[in-house]
Every structure is written in structure tokens, then in C-alpha cells.
From Swiss-Prot:
It is an enzyme of class 4 (lyase). 3-dehydroquinate binds at residues 21, 46-48, 82, 213, 232, 236. The active site is at 143 (proton donor/acceptor), 170 (schiff-base intermediate with substrate). This is 3-dehydroquinate dehydratase. The keyword rRNA processing does not apply. It comes from Salmonella typhimurium (strain LT2 / SGSC1412 / ATCC 700720).
Length: 252
């Protein structure tokens, strides 16, 4: 299993890494959130660009990215436009989405981008290659806010991400029952033990799935999302509580 190193952070060894999401709508909001996050205990800062009002203006996006980078200087920055169809705030055409991610890569301000698996294989492959040429890592993602697919389907999607060149495959699914949480955990173990040659991130959302956000080290998920202020997805818990639990499980 190879690890992924971003700045000085090694993902895929030790306790799962904590990712927090910044979701400001304006550049003023983005700056104030980044300042508020500066003292929080996390490993990776995700900028959820789909919350940013001026997302279709590249200059505004890059100005905001620069502002974040000036305030949070030492942590890896993950650039994420979550599409409306996968639970995000706005919709872009495929062309706009790819152009936005390429602009982020070109900027030199971000360390990682999030690419949704179902954007289209050709577009995804080309954008992964482009990111890698610029030393930007790729988290490839899929989100189902309605249900939990069968374990075989979860594994298949994660394997597809790996085949398309993702540095870190990621999937988040919604449980309707407690058994659905076990389905996600079973799929995580199977992927991690049988197929993965790189770190993966998995989670079962909502309060029902919260155990999956805590027990990643046990089952094979290399990172988890926590909340500094407002949760970016259902079931997230505070970073302070998250770090405590992750450390307990790591040292057990």
C-alpha cells in the first residue's frame, strides 16, 4: 500500500487524517472562516467552492484561493466543487467544471483537487493527468445522499477510481438502516484488503453512520471529515472530539 504525501502530511499511515470544509459565500466570508479555522486541530483544509457565489468568475475564485492560502499557510488545501447532483450547492456544465479545476491546478495555490467519478471517464482521466503534471493530487469522489449501494457496487466504484488514476478514492453513502452502515464498512475492508494499492476514504453519513467517521483506522479509511463550525455533511462531529476518538483508537 503506497501512501500519499501532500506538503508534509502523509495520508495512509497512522491515524486517519482530519479534513475540514470551508464554505464561505463571499471573499469576506472565506477570509473570516479561514481566520476562525487557523487555531483548529485538523490536517487538510477543503475549500467547498460550490458555496462561493462568484464561482463562474475565475479571477474571483483565484483571489479567494489566494486569500485562504495567505491565512492557512501550512496545511494542504483541497479544492472541491461539489456538483448539485452529488449534494453540492450549484450546478456547472461539465466543461465549466473541468475548466474550474484546471484553473485551480494552474494557480499553484492548491495541493489537491476533488474530481467526481461520474464526470465522464475521458474528462476525468485527462484532468487527473493534468493535475499530476502540476504536482497536484486528486481525490476522486462519489456521493449518494439517498441510499447505500450494495457492497459489491461500492467496491466497484472505488476500484474504478483507482483505475482512472485517483491518488485517493473516496465514497460517501447514506444509510437507511444500521445494516447499511455495516455494508459500507464491509465494502471498505474488502477494498482495502483485496484491491487498494493506495489510501481510500469512505463514510456512511448521518447520525446513523457516525461510527464510520470514527473507526476508519480499524476498517481501512485513511481520512475523515469533521466540523469546526457548520457541518458540510450530515453526521460530522467536532474536530476536537474527532481527534480525541481517533487518537484513542490509534493507541489502543
Amino acid at each position: 500500500m503506497k501512501t500519499v504525501t501532500v506538503r508534509d502530511l502523509v495520508v495512509g499511515e497512522g491515524a486517519p487524517k482530519i479534513i475540514v470544509s470551508l464554505m464561505g459565500k463571499t471573499i469576506t466570508d472565506v477570509k473570516s472562516e479561514a481566520l476562525a479555522y487557523r487555531e483548529a486541530d485538523f490536517d487538510i483544509l477543503e475549500w467547498r467552492v460550490d458555496h462561493f457565489a462568484n464561482v463562474t468568475t475565475a479571477e474571483s475564485v483565484l483571489e479567494a484561493a489566494g486569500a485562504i492560502r495567505e491565512i492557512i499557510t501550512d496545511k494542504p488545501l483541497l479544492f472541491t466543487f461539489r456538483s448539485a447532483k452529488e449534494g453540492g450547492e450549484q450546478a456547472l456544465t461539465t466543461g465549466q467544471y473541468i475548466d474550474l479545476n484546471r484553473a485551480a491546478v494552474d494557480s499553484g495555490l492548491v495541493d489537491m483537487i476533488d474530481l467526481e467519478l461520474f464526470t465522464g471517464d475521458d474528462e476525468v482521466k485527462a484532468t487527473v493527468g493534468y493535475a499530476h503534471q502540476h504536482n497536484v493530487a486528486v481525490i476522486m469522489s462519489n456521493h449518494d445522499f439517498h441510499k447505500t449501494p450494495a457492497a459489491e457496487e461500492i467496491v466497484q466504484r472505488l476500484r474504478k477510481m483507482q483505475e482512472l488514476g485517483a491518488d485517493i478514492p473516496k465514497i460517501a453513502v447514506m444509510p437507511q438502516t444500521k445494516a447499511d452502515v455495516l455494508t459500507l464498512l464491509t465494502a471498505t475492508v474488502e477494498m482495502q484488503e483485496r484491491y487498494a494499492d493506495r489510501p481510500i476514504i469512505t463514510m456512511s453519513m448521518s447520525k446513523t453512520g457516525v461510527i464510520s467517521r470514527l473507526a476508519g483506522e480499524v476498517f481501512g479509511s485513511a481520512a475523515t471529515f469533521g466540523a469546526v463550525k457548520k457541518a458540510s455533511a450530515p453526521g460530522q462531529i467536532s474536530v476536537a472530539d474527532l481527534r480525541t476518538v481517533l487518537t484513542i483508537l490509534h493507541q489502543a
